[in-house]
A protein has these predicted regions:
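Residue-level preference for non-acidic, small/hydrophobic
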Residues: 45, 111, 134-136
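Alpha-helical assembly-interface signal, strongest on the long, hydrophobic N-terminal helix that forms
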Residues: 2-76
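Short amphipathic secondary-structure patches
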Residues: 49-112
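Short secondary-structure transition/capping segments
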Residues: 2-8, 96-105, 136-143
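Low-complexity, S/T/G/P-rich flexible repeat/linker segments used as non-globular hinges
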Residues: 119-143
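Generic short beta-strand segments
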Residues: 113-119
Length: 143
């Protein structure tokens, strides 16, 4: 069968497509999906930060001028992160709030999210996570 140059050339191109080009195309699509998911995580984190910034304990702020979040801030932030992640939840990627912190100097609330993005890649790549952080300003100047 492999007595001509054409047969060798055909076999070489079949091997090249099978082992080089097709896996590279699959990875390129996966990386594109990853960056889209990353942008979605930052959008979700911004929504979660805005929601958490609404959960300021007003009585504590009036007494001490310190921003303290209510205990419900984590749950509200988690709910708003889920509301703003349609692309992710459509692919069974569920962002979860990993941290909420308050910067007293700038009066900003920061929310960090993390999700397992392994479903965007082939099965040999597991443990791929995507992170996002959002910020919102707690505007309490009129109080």
């Amino acid at each position: 069968m492999l007595h001509s140059r054409k047969a060798y050339s055909t076999l070489w191109w079949i091997g090249y497509y099978t082992f080089c080009l097709i896996p590279l195309m699959v990875m390129a699509v996966g990386i594109g999906r990853y960056f889209y998911a990353r942008a979605e995580m930052f959008k979700s984190a911004d929504g979660a930060a805005l929601a958490a910034a609404q959960e300021v304990d007003v009585v504590t702020y009036l007494n001490t001028k310190q921003i303290v979040l209510l205990p419900s801030a984590y749950g509200v932030a988690q709910a708003y992160a889920a509301y703003n992640s349609d692309y992710l939840t459509g692919r069974r990627i569920y962002p979860r709030v990993t941290a909420i912190r308050v910067d007293q100097a700038t009066k900003k609330v920061y929310v960090s999210l993390r999700a397992d993005a392994s479903s965007l890649f082939p099965s040999i790549l597991r443990g791929v996570t995507v992170n996002g952080e959002g910020e919102a300003e707690a505007r309490l100047g009129s109080l």
